[in-house]
Amino acid sequence: MQKKLIAAAVAGALVAPAAMADGHGVAVSGSIRTGVEYTGDDWQVADNYSRLRFKASSDLGNGQSAYMNYEFRVNSAQGSIVTGDTQRLSYVGIKGDWGSLSLGAQWSTAFNTVGTFIDKTNRYGGTGNTCIQYRMKNSVMLSTQLGGLSLMADAQMSTGGDTLDRGTVGGLFSIGGLSLGAVYQSADADCMGVAAAMNIAGIGISGGFTDTDGGDTGYGVNASIGGLWLDYETNDSSDGVITGSYGLGLGGGAKMILEVSNNGDDTMGIGMLRMDF
């Protein structure tokens, strides 16, 4: 009985805030992603970055609004919350017709403009993103839209580091079926990248190039048709990595995903059930 009461209390705690703050657009969502993985040496039941998310927004008047996002990573294979730096997203911001300003741990300008064209994997990608941060902690970001041109910039200011650890500017431009992205980052090791994507006769093609000042260059290309997706990524310090993925939607937010990857030495793979809510 006590366990049932606790479960009911937890469920009520999740639902009640959304109902009480409906005027502020509170929403609870997330994704659970669990599969059976072959690591190259062994088989295991593994989590694939499951998460629980809380979002809210509030109308400030004059076309302005405030918004926030809390996201917690969950290890669905072990039934635990995963802690540590930049496990998921956590930010607060203000937006209007002029654009948006946000602070916290958020998707970086480098990933939004270039990295996302290179790495579209569910688990095994990223070799070509030599100097691309995915989620960036201790960051402030400004973005705006000028017609078909999206401009964004961010700065990372971590405790104990330099006053400005990284400063990044980037942009996205779309014309017809072609999308282009570019980024430049000033850091201890400067970074630049370019990327593009287009659709030809139902086949989606994308890719990009990254270069680290005094370090590695890397690139990746990928193609998709229907639920099938193929990717090749490489950089100066590693062999090429080939990854293939197939996703089958089951309805109701559920999806079956099979992904296999080979880095020239080992083959890894995961068969995963994902459900978004």
Describe the residue ranges of each PLM region.
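Outer-membrane beta-barrel proteins
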Residues: 1-277
